[in-house]
Amino acid sequence: MKVHLRVFVEMENLGKAMNALTDAGITGFYILEYKGMSPDDWKGYSIKEDPKSAIGMVHKFATPAVLICSVVDEELVDQMTDRIMKELEGERFTVLQVPIRKIVVKSGNKGNKDKTVFN
C-alpha cells in the first residue's frame, strides 16, 4: 500500500526534516508554506466567527510553518517517522500517515490515456 506522508514542521526545521526524510529513503516531495496555531496558542482568546477577524488573528499570532508531503511505500513509513523523531528531537512537529487506496494520473492530453499508478 502507498501512504501519503505529511510532516508539519516549523520553518527553521525544514532543512533538518528534508534531510532526515531523504536519508530514510524518500524519493520526492512537495512542500506547502502556511501559518499554524495549536489550541494552546489561542487559549483564553475568544475568536470572533466572522472570517475577517478569524483570519486576522491567524496572521497576527500564528507561527510560520511548512508541510512536507510525499507518497511513499507503507514499508518505509516507520523508518521515515523514526528518522524524523530522532533528527527533530526537542522540536515541535506533527507526522500524519494517510493510506492511499488509488492514484490516477491525468495527462491533460486527449490523445494520451489516463494511467492508474496504484490501485
Regions found by a protein language model. Name each.
Residues M1-N119:
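Positively charged, small/polar-rich N-terminal and surface patches that mediate targeting and assembly
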